[in-house]
Amino acid sequence: ATHFYNAMPVVYKEHEFKVPGTVESVYALQDMTVETIADGIHVPPVMLHVVYQIKGVEKMALITDSLAYAACNGEVTCEPRVILEDGVCKLADHSALAGSIATMDTLIRTSILKAEIPMIDVFRMASETPAKIMGVFDRKGSIEEGKDADIIMFDKDINLTYVMQMGHEKTNCL
């Protein structure tokens, strides 16, 4: 389930009966994975922790859903009907979120510091789990002999300090 919790109905009432929504159905399907925009805006930190507790590290992947304006600050017009405001793209009429500008390091910091998910699990949800979902774990998602050398490093405050992609240092990513 991609964009988990975004534009997904939760339990609702149909006549006198309660009917499970998409969210409850996804939780009930134990084998289903979820992809969550863990920026703390699309899904609040407390809900990120709930998803982690229910689905676990093997079934929860972090995704950015970043638009072309990822990492931008301030208020800009993204498209005629979308504005960047308060760190997120919104519909111009403010009726809904329209996309994320968060980068993966932001999702990692939010998951560790605000959602209080263990660091080792957060890194797995940002690398191993997505690689398994996409069917590329034979070459991505972990540091092992024979796999692509895609490596990132953080400082003690979880700020990105080093990027290596396919064995090559990337200096324009920081």
What is each stretch, according to the model?
Residues K18-T36, M47, Y52-K147, I151-F154:
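His/Asp/Glu-enriched, well-ordered alpha-helical/loop segment
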Residues A1-N6, M60-T64:
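Non-cysteine beta-strand/loop elements that form the S-adenosyl-L-methionine
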Residues Y162-T171:
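Short, compositionally biased
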Residues A1, D157-N159:
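Short strand-connecting beta-turns/loops that link adjacent beta-strands
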Residues D39-P45:
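Glycine-rich anion/phosphate-binding loop at the beta-strand->alpha-helix junction
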Residues T2-P20, A71, G167:
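Histidine/acidic-residue-rich, glycine-tolerant segments that coordinate divalent metal ions
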Residues Y5, G40, L67-A68:
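Catalytic metal-binding/acid-base residues of hydrolase active sites
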